[in-house]
Structure formats: structure tokens, C-alpha cells
Amino acid sequence: PDAYIEHFAYDKECFLDDFPREAKMQDVCKTLNSVGFSSPPSWLKPYAVLSNGEKMRCDLARAILSEKELFVFDEFTSVVDRNVAKIGSLAMQKAIRQSDNKKQFIAVTCHFDVIEWLQPDFIFNTNDMTFSLSSKKKDQTSLYQYTKYQQHKTSGNIGKCLANIII
């Protein structure tokens, strides 16, 4: 439940002031750039005046900079146009992969167009209740984790066998 990110509180004049205090400015800049928010003049604005795409990227960067190892974004790309959704998904995928397996990201979305950009390790489709390996991630680690999932799915103890990016 505490991994679920519904929204962050932003009440400062510059949204950067709401980022984790322990985060170094170099890491903040690197993370904002890694999620595709590469406009330093916009970094000085209040969160409320950002575009939906900038808000999405800001929230993603803040989640990455948080101490949480697992975070879940519901309606991951629903408030942005589809091109921004794809670009944001690619940027997020790269940022998570660069975390050296320190972060896990679960994207909850009804939009299938982001799958090839997000390149999740696993996909759970609620339309037909199927759980599958992403076609691009069929490496040994993912196969091992998927096998563990198959063995433990009836026990309800599957949280530890998942990988970095799940959709």
C-alpha cells in the first residue's frame, strides 16, 4: 500500500524544493533528465503551472529519488497524449534499468501502446487475467522469475519473484 503513488504533495514555489531533502542536486538533475524532463527553466516553476506531461515526469523523478524500492503508478500515462506517454515510458524504462536493480516499478495502465516503450519484464492483462513474460525480456533472469511465479501463484506469496518493470 505505501508503494502506491496516487499523488505527491507540492506546496513550494519551486517544485524542486518538494523533492527529498537528502537527494543531491546533481542526482535531481540527472533523474529529471533521465525521465525526459530536460528544461531547467521549467524546474523553477511551481508544480501547479506545469503541463500534464511535465507533472508526470516530475512525479516519476520524485519517485525514483525517494527511498522506496518499489513504487506503483496507477493510470501511468492516462493524463498525457500518446506521444508523450511513449516518450515518458521509454525514459522511465531507462531510468529504472539504470538503477542497478535497486528499484521496482509497476505501471498500471489501460493503454497497450506503451508496452513496447516501457519494455516491462512481465505483463498482467486484466482483460483476460493472463500473466506473461514480455516478448523483449525473455532472458534467463526473467525466465527464472516467471517460473518462480508459476510455482507460487496459488500460494499468494509472489511479490518477491517479480522483476524491475511490470505493467
What are these regions (language model features)?
Residues K138-I167:
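Non-catalytic substrate-recognition and accessory regions of acyl/acetyltransferase enzymes
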Residues P1-G36, E116-W117:
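ABC ATPase nucleotide-binding domain signature region
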Residues R82-N101:
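Helical segment within the ABC ATPase nucleotide-binding domain
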Residues K102-Q104, H111-Y146:
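C-terminal lobe/lid and adjacent interdomain/linker elements of RecA-like ASCE P-loop ATPase modules
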Residues K68-L70, Q98-I106:
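Loop/turn-to-beta-strand initiation segments
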Residues S42-A48:
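Interfacial catalytic loop of ABC nucleotide-binding domains
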Residues T31-P40, N52-F73:
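GG-anchored amphipathic helix commonly corresponding to the ABC/SMC/Rad50 NBD signature/C-loop
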Residues V72-V84:
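Walker B catalytic motif
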